[in-house]
UniProtKB/Swiss-Prot annotation:
Signal peptide: 1-26
Subcellular compartments: Secreted
An annotated GO BP: receptor guanylyl cyclase signaling pathway
Modifications after synthesis and translation: The precursor molecule is proteolytically cleaved by the endoproteases FURIN or CORIN at Arg-108 to produce the brain natriuretic peptide 32. CORIN also cleaves the precursor molecule at additional residues including Arg-105, Arg-108 and possibly Lys-111.
InterPro entries: Natr_peptide, Natr_peptide_CS, Natriuretic_peptide, Natriuretic_peptide_brain
Protein name (Swiss-Prot/TrEMBL): Natriuretic peptides B
Disulphide-bridged cysteine pairs: 118-134
Organism, scientific name: Canis lupus familiaris (Dog)
């Protein structure tokens, strides 16, 4: 073997040995050792703990769904027209009866889009300074 090829191979072997786990698992066809049986027991106890947590989570979710189903008829009985108008809501904050579509319609109104170009406000500001954009009058 050439000396210049032996050095990289030796370094790769050392790197592999350094990165390989110390408590690595034996080949599955090999015999069982007490250490492998102990690790399997700890994995089984960990699996049991995860199953216990999963059971608790399922119970909590079913309780929350039952509460939600119990409260759903109460929410259906109140329509938005019956809700009292709250005068204390600030003007800038969206009221509960405002939907997202109404807010988007207000933003797309001709009043808001009067001086907007094709890229949007922020890019139009950049475009007006750099000369890039749709509605830019170039001075030559």
């Amino acid at each position: 073997m050439e000396p210049c090829a032996a050095l990289p191979r030796a370094l790769l072997l050392l790197l592999f040995l350094h990165l390989s786990p110390l408590g690595g698992r034996p080949h599955p066809l090999g015999g069982r050792s007490p250490a492998s049986e102990a690790s399997e027991a700890s994995e089984a106890s960990g699996l049991w703990a995860v199953q216990e947590l999963l059971g608790r989570l399922k119970d909590a979710v079913s309780e929350l769904q039952a509460e939600q189903l119990a409260l759903e008829p109460l929410h259906r009985s109140h329509s938005p027209a019956e809700a009292p108008e709250a005068g204390g809501t600030p003007r800038g904050v969206l009221a509960p009866h405002d939907s997202v579509l109404q807010a988007l319609r207000r933003l797309r109104s001709p009043k808001m889009m009067h001086k907007s170009g094709c890229f949007g406000r922020r890019l139009d500001r950049i475009g007006s300074l750099s000369g890039l954009g749709c509605n830019v009058l170039r001075k030559y």
